[in-house]
Structure formats: C-alpha cells, structure tokens
C-alpha cells in the first residue's frame, strides 16, 4: 500500500493539471503559430510561469486499490499484482488465466 501522503500529492497534481489545462493548451497553440521570435519568447515565459505540477507529464497512474505507481494496466486501473489476484479469484469477467 502506498503512503497516504503520496496518493494525496498525486491527487493535488491532478487537480492542478485540470485547472491549468486550457491555459497550457492555448499557449502551446500560440507558440506553434508563425510569429516573431520575441512574441514566442513572451508566450514561452507565460507557459513557464505556470506551476510545474500543472504539467501532465508529472502525473502517474496509480492502482486505485493499493496506490501502486508501477505496472498499471490502463484498461482496469489496477496494478499487475492485484489484477492477477482478481483474475484468479474470478472477479474480473472475461479475463482468462493463461495455461499451457
């Protein structure tokens, strides 16, 4: 189980990313337009002035049961360890154990 503080920090990052999403997207569109270099630098400074944690690259997917940040399956939102346990317990419909 991940520490509560790490999970809380990740939730704060997600909220901050949602808050600044439109600002970041519009700034990036403006930078991609053909503008004088001085204008691009101004827009770039505006983009850099936003908080670091508002960047989507700083988010991690976490298992919603354990909070584990690694080995996550997007389709289920679970870590590999928990996914395997749930498949063995027949809690995930349609998932088949591999056997050979």
Swiss-Prot record:
The keyword RNA-binding applies. One of its GO terms (biological process) is translation. GO terms for cellular component: chloroplast; small ribosomal subunit. InterPro entries: Ribosomal_uS14, Ribosomal_uS14_bac/plastid, Ribosomal_uS14_CS. It is found in: Plastid, Chloroplast. GO terms for molecular function: rRNA binding; structural constituent of ribosome. Belongs to the universal ribosomal protein uS14 family. Binds 16S rRNA, required for the assembly of 30S particles. Part of the 30S ribosomal subunit. This is Small ribosomal subunit protein uS14c. It comes from Dioscorea elephantipes.
């Amino acid at each position: 189980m991940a520490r509560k503080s790490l999970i809380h920090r990740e939730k704060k990052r997600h909220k901050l990313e949602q808050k600044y999403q439109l600002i970041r997207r519009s700034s990036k569109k403006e930078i991609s337009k053909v503008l004088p270099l001085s204008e691009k630098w101004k827009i770039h400074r505006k983009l850099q002035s936003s908080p670091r944690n508002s960047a989507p690259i700083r988010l991690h997917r976490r298992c919603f049961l354990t909070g584990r940040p690694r080995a996550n399956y997007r389709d289920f939102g679970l870590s590999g360890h928990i996914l395997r346990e749930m498949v063995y317990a027949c809690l995930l419909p349609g998932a088949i154990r591999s056997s050979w």
